[in-house]
């Protein structure tokens, strides 16, 4: 057994620290991306082009789709023929750690499509479970095998200074690691991520089908500084969830003992839902979660991605689009804050942060 990353001196940097690059996956799963994923592919392309201005983008695309991806992206990315079941690079890619000598270590978690047989979203996830190790191998990075511990990248945020942010709703979900206690889960995170402290938010975003990943509800924008998804509408189920998170964060400190500065980032004013027009576009596998008309989608501006030169922020043709851009522009004065029309990614079940995974410098 290899020593834990913590014992070996590795830690997980913050997303706002310098990147070597970003991992993404071409969207092709018919049960996630309606109408051959045409609209999603346009959105992915805009995201890739924006990120590529400041860092390398690695795109996993199987041979059958390579010429299609090249028709959108040309030579803007590094193409890797690694098989996948879907395009959620945040959740299937490795968590890459660094040490003080600049060496990298890729953590490979078990992936079971957000809940396995208990409440997973699809049952054919064998390729997805291999993405982290195969990608690390392609990069020539050593791998720390954290299996059978189940975790997705969207379930953790790091401040790069010893603090990890998670939600209880996800990490304590019966579909993840039901045989482990909360204390055992926390210890695994600390050892695997080289961290000192885990902060457990009670909730994520209402009806987030990942069991409420933290990356949809809260994110570090600097040391001891966070954004939190918020609504003032007390009739929205999100209100009580965000309020509980805020109350916890206001009492908490980071690993260094600092209190948090918390910026409230409004959720879209208008509920984002699946429409009748969306439904004919999906083709499902057996055992795959199906969409229904009127289903509320877990839309949140917190699902942004911090690239080297830009912050990419979901946009929903909503009155709060600009509000979110303005708040994040103040948080990131040294980066270009770019709004990306994101409903077509949201229809797949996630957003910009869910389809990207940073590779630290």
UniProtKB/Swiss-Prot annotation:
GO molecular function: agmatine deiminase activity; protein-arginine deiminase activity
Enzyme type, top EC level: hydrolase
Keywords: Hydrolase
Active site, per annotation: 354
InterPro entries: Agmatine_deiminase (IPR017754), Peptidyl-Arg-deiminase_porph (IPR007466)
Coiled-coil residue spans: none
Presence of the UniProt keyword Hydrolase in the record: yes
E.C. numbers: 3.5.3.12
Biological process, per Gene Ontology: putrescine biosynthetic process
Catalysed transformations (reactions): agmatine + H2O = N-carbamoylputrescine + NH4(+)
Source domain of life: Bacteria
Keyword Hydrolase annotated: yes
HAMAP family in UniProt: Agmatine_deimin (MF_01841)
Similarity-based family: Belongs to the agmatine deiminase family.
Record protein name field: Putative agmatine deiminase
Organism: Streptococcus pneumoniae (strain P1031)
Gene: aguA
